[in-house]
Amino acid sequence: MGTKIKTHKGTKKRFRLSAKGKAMHRQSGTSHLAKGLSKKRRRNLRGTTAVAECMEPTIHAALNGHSY
């Protein structure tokens, strides 16, 4: 009987799975020094966006407690 592999907590805080199973994350560039960006750019950085397809298996594995 082996031990379970734990969920990676850093990944859990940064990523969420959508209803269809896609990994979603917040966009970068809004924490500070955003005043220099146009309002349109700041508005478009709001919300979440899907992760690149090549990273999906790694993120799913980290969230579901599997080794990768």
From Swiss-Prot:
Cross-referenced Gene3D superfamilies: 4.10.410.60
InterPro entries: Ribosomal_bL35 (IPR001706), Ribosomal_bL35-like (IPR021137), Ribosomal_bL35_sf (IPR037229)
Keywords, comma-separated and alphabetical: Ribonucleoprotein, Ribosomal protein
Biased composition (Basic residues): 1-25
Biological processes annotated in GO: translation
Keyword S-adenosyl-L-methionine: no
Region Disordered: start-end pairs: 1-43
The keyword Ribonucleoprotein is assigned to this record: yes
Transmembrane segments annotated in the record for this chain: none
A cellular component term, taken from the record's GO annotations: cytosolic large ribosomal subunit
GO molecular function, one term: structural constituent of ribosome
Protein origin, superkingdom: Bacteria
Pfam families tied to this protein: Ribosomal_L35p
Similarity comment: family membership: Belongs to the bacterial ribosomal protein bL35 family.
Protein name: Large ribosomal subunit protein bL35
Species of the source: Rhodopirellula baltica (strain DSM 10527 / NCIMB 13988 / SH1)
Lineage of source species: Bacteria, Pseudomonadati, Planctomycetota, Planctomycetia, Pirellulales
Gene: rpmI
